[in-house]
UniProtKB/Swiss-Prot annotation:
Protein role: Catalyzes the transfer of endogenously produced octanoic acid from octanoyl-acyl-carrier-protein onto the lipoyl domains of lipoate-dependent enzymes. Lipoyl-ACP can also act as a substrate although octanoyl-ACP is likely to be the physiological substrate.
PROSITE patterns per the UniProt record, alphabetical: BPL_LPL_CATALYTIC, LIPB
Phosphoprotein listed as a keyword: no
Protein's organism: Mycobacterium avium (strain 104)
Protein name, as recorded: Octanoyltransferase
Lineage: Bacteria, Bacillati, Actinomycetota, Actinomycetes, Mycobacteriales
Binding-site positions, substrate: R76, G77, G78, K79, I80, T81, W82, H83, A148, I149, G150, G161, F162, A163
Gene: lipB
Cytoplasm as UniProt keyword: yes
Biological pathway: Protein modification; protein lipoylation via endogenous pathway; protein N(6)-(lipoyl)lysine from octanoyl-[acyl-carrier-protein]: step 1/2
Compositional bias annotation for Basic and acidic residues: 57-66
HAMAP family: LipB
Site feature: Lowers pKa of active site Cys: K145
Length: 233
């Protein structure tokens, strides 16, 4: 049985926007959310941002850049992160079906990105208690986040979304405590696969799989580190 999380059966309007200033994209999200509440379509924005730090509602003062670099405070969940060139950002503006299940929504975004990584040859997992998509730690290296997720739901409509590190500058994360997690690392598809993986290489797959996950065509499965070990035995 296909189990969509969306309240609409119409196709999602996927828009590839190139590079967009963060504040401009945030305003576009709010405009689209207003339109969705008024009966407009579900929309998925796919884009990159010029380099910027953004802080979710739970960001602590000590997690901000120590050098005073400006930070855009947002109304999404989560803590501080970085966006910039080489990172694919997705903002689904989706009307959720009742009863609302935000955890299920986040799991569906994770499922899509886990499948994107798997199709490229990268094994990724969920980490209990932490959102996003992770490369499990090994050989003395910690778990490493390759995709971050931070969302907001208002009037049964989603805003903000996910960021998949493709070939971005990982050094930008060194000035902050990414997502408030000090005992794990940040990585990219390029770093893990040891070959160039650009945003353009994954944007079509991300668009298709996010839509499939939200519509229930791609079901949510178990991807914990424990399940990974068990399946390898």
């Amino acid at each position: 049985m296909i189990d969509s999380i969306r309240s609409s059966r119409a196709l999602i309007d996927v828009r590839r926007l190139g590079t967009v200033d963060y504040r401009a994209a945030w305003q576009q999200q709010r405009d689209l959310a207003d339109a969705r509440v008024a009966g407009g379509p579900d929309t998925l924005l796919l884009l990159q941002h010029p380099a910027v730090y953004t802080a979710g509602r739970r960001t602590e003062p000590h997690e901000r850049p120590l050098d005073g670099t400006p930070v855009v405070d947002t109304d999404r969940g989560g803590k501080i992160t970085w966006h910039g060139p080489g990172q694919l950002v997705g903002y689904p503006i989706i009307g959720l079906a009742e009863p609302l299940d935000v955890v299920d929504y986040v799991r569906r975004l994770e499922e899509a990105l886990i499948k994107v990584c798997a199709d490229l040859g990268l094994d990724t997992v969920r980490v209990p208690g932490r959102s996003g998509v992770w490369v499990p730690g090994d050989a003395g290296r910690p778990d490493r986040k390759v995709a971050a997720i931070g969302v907001r739901v208002s009037r049964a409509t989603t805003l903000h979304g996910f960021a998949l590190n493709c070939d971005c500058d990982l050094g930008a994360f060194s000035a902050i405590v990414p997502c408030g997690i000090s005992d794990a690392g940040v990585t990219s598809l390029t770093a893990e696969l040891r070959r160039p993986v650009a945003v353009d290489d994954v944007v079509t797959s991300v668009a298709d799989l996010v839509c499939d996950a939200l519509d229930g065509v791609l079901p949510v499965r178990e991807h914990s580190p424990g399940a990974r070990v068990a399946s390898a035995m």
